């Protein structure tokens, strides 16, 4: 008897700068096949035909998949429309092909799911490994699917729910797709791609944030993979020259001793094989002091200089209560930021605009709270999204009068979406923030990103805050009032407002390239910074800043002039990168005074360094404003020596 052909589909966009041609190996479907293929009943009855990992031409892909008896799709926000189109066309060409779907973006709570998606035969609602094996065995044994828990079955366009499936009790039962050769075929066939890899060291999240579907989809309880397997996978990643690795733990650092060992292994692999070149992870929400040992350890490797992410989401207590999120106490956040500041560790704070209960005033105050707490180098401003299975989408939409719109150029990598556009459902208003107020908040975020977070006025405002008691709210209110009289600033502000309005009205930002850089929802907030480099506007903008500070604040002229010089040298101007590194002597120790409370009037030499290649092209430099934000790209590394 011939074996049934099965293909598994998990396409993604190209990742990062175009020149890397970087793509993720399809881990989610890979781990499914690694699990089921260890059983004789599967090996005897099924043959894996294809793994679809890239958004290739739809008709070519349909032609391949239509030969199969079964096609399974792993569905996320970045591949949903592509997957639906692919599945529909396969079903049209081969009605006997069984179509399985799973993944976080499946509308499993919607009773009309199969009326809208009639080409799908069955949806796996949760963890897929055990359920997929049971389903495949039922097909080969010709037994009923309805006895398998964890499915939505399409019965004459009606959804039959078989209940909740069992969660995997022991993650040791899951073989590695890397170590069992699941990806060997595609890696041998495709040689012009830099592969990205995904590693699960544990599975689950103990939190229930309403904007996120992580905790709900993983049943909250955290289970761990064996360290031996994790280490072997990291070794494989290094040996196979994977350029980037994502550790998918919801809270890396939660298990301090274990995660320290994983960090040690990651460093050892990078040093031995030269790969991976970079990594990403979601750090533990409740960050203990021991977590910093892991961060400092990683950042000593020049490839791993992303620093620490502190995901606060909002700085307002009412908003946090609405989203079922509890942040670290303010004094703990301040200690974290101070520790990172003094040790030159980039620190990165994530906040989300559009959460239930957020107002324009609380949103603005949130930035000032972050600055007062001590984070000045990195704040990532995200727009709230309505994820399919998140509580905010399922239960809170009516309660908080949340409106949203599908935005089709929100994600990076959209330059290779071909004719099938993917969208993100972006929040545009709530009962606490109208659409116009949302626009005002987006403009304020752009203003903070351009001037404080990207470095143009960071040390000026920090110095005035400490020396003269000028609160950040006062400084930036005055700066806004000053700049709003300038034609260049007004033009930039009007343009950014127009592009943000575009996504609320037509679902696309529709921004032209800056140089050769695609502008989308993730990086439009950096638009002005990109233009300043491309159009050589830095001198003009610093002249504006100098006149503003001189007119608004009373400072000793010598101190003021040197403060402005220090500030100007903090920010890297693309047109001046050939002069790095260099040293400048000052009569005032601004860095020591701000960070360590040392005497201000102290002679000191500051060394300003640019830790990237000075041969970097303008396009690559502009790309790194966004892609390098976690390593504080665009700002100098400052060290000092006494005179």
Please give the residue ranges for each predicted region:
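N-terminal [4Fe-4S]-dependent radical SAM core
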Residues: 1-7, 13-14, 154-198
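Radical SAM enzyme core and accessory elements
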Residues: 2-8, 17-18, 41-45, 63, ...
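Glycine-rich beta-alpha loop elements in corrinoid/cobalamin-binding modules
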Residues: 4, 35, 44-168
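Short hydrophobic segments within beta-strands
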Residues: 9-12, 74, 102, 248
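Glycine- and acidic-residue-enriched helix-capping/strand-helix junction motifs
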Residues: 15-30
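Radical SAM [4Fe-4S] cluster-binding motif and immediate context
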Residues: 24, 177-342
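Hydrophobic positions in alpha-helices of CheY-like receiver
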Residues: 36, 89-90, 266, 336, ...
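Conserved C-terminal portion of the radical SAM core fold
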Residues: 70-72, 234-248, 274, 278-282, ...
